């Protein structure tokens, strides 16, 4: 009976540990997303404030002048190339930094997931162990009650 009580309390502790690990995992992922978005937005703000870029109207006028010189197919290629070259400039050096941070966080997350898997396996084994004790306890031969074997006593 003591072994049964010990295994029940151990199962409860492991289940609690699994819940803590799962909540830590989800909290870490949400914090990681917030940090990455803050890092990117702060870097974008500093890059935009440091570099003096022409206004949107100047860019539009320049693009219109260039596009009138090109044919339609060349214009499409030029716009695609400009878009491909402008996106890394917006993120700047933070894309590599964000990728590195994400990789480090995902390693921690994968370690937590592996730990959670191990805890769940142990929990499953303990549940099987407890079920074995329950079945062993209920599979005992029932005690015979002293009943009179009289046909008139059936109710």
From Swiss-Prot:
GO cellular component terms, semicolon-separated: extracellular region; host cell plasma membrane; membrane
Motif (RxLR-dEER): 34-64
Localisation: Secreted; Host cell membrane
Key words, A-Z: Host cell membrane, Host membrane, Membrane, Secreted, Signal, Virulence
Annotated signal peptide: 1-24
Induction: Expression is up-regulated during the early plant infection stages.
Domain notes: Has the canonical translocation RxLR motif, but lacks the canonical EER motif, which characterizes most oomycete effectors identified so far.
Reported function: Secreted effector that does not suppress pattern-triggered immunity (PTI) in plant host.
Protein family according to the UniProt entry: Belongs to the RxLR effector family.
Protein name listed in UniProt: Secreted RxLR effector protein RXLR-C301
Organism of origin: Plasmopara halstedii (Downy mildew of sunflower)
The gene coding this protein: RXLR-C30
């Amino acid at each position: 009976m003591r072994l049964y009580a010990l295994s029940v309390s151990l199962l409860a502790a492991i289940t609690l540990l699994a819940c803590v690990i799962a909540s830590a995992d989800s909290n870490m992922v949400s914090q990681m997303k917030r940090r990455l978005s803050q890092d990117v937005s702060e870097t974008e703000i500093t890059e935009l404030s440091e570099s003096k870029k022409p206004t949107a109207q100047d860019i539009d006028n320049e693009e219109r002048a260039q596009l009138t010189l090109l044919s339609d197919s060349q214009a499409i290629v030029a716009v695609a190339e400009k878009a491909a070259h402008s996106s890394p400039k917006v993120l700047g050096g933070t894309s590599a930094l964000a990728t590195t941070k994400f990789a480090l966080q995902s390693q921690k997350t994968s370690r937590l997931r592996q730990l959670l898997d191990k805890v769940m396996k142990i929990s499953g084994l303990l549940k099987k162990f407890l079920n074995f004790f329950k079945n062993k306890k209920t599979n005992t031969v029932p005690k015979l009650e002293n009943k009179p074997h009289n046909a008139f006593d059936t109710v």
